[in-house]
């Protein structure tokens, strides 16, 4: 079992291969409500993570974003591919 820091590093590497930028920010200090998640900003793919959330939540946000992209042509850690495949299978059954 990987520790949470190595899982986050694996996810950041996968996102980087897809040219997805990841920013961690204090979202409580914003003038308007922002939640962690994926967006496009000036044509660039971006994941914004609230620094006040636990690392486990960061993992989920990045994983949910990676599910939207084609990962067939890039290397991603086995656990990421397994998790995404498991989630897709579970979603197809419901």
Enumerate the language-model features and the residues they cover.
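Auxiliary, metal-adjacent structural segments of Zn-dependent hydrolase domains
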Residues: 1-34
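Short acidic DE-rich linear segments
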Residues: 2, 86-94
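Short coil/turn linker and secondary-structure boundary residues
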Residues: 3-6, 53, 71-75
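Active-site scaffold of zinc-dependent metalloenzymes
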Residues: 27, 35-56
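Short C-terminal domain-edge/linker segments immediately following a structured domain
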Residues: 52-56, 77-82, 91
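Active-site alpha-helix of zinc metalloproteases
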Residues: 59-60
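C-terminal structural segments of small proteins and small subunits
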Residues: 63-87
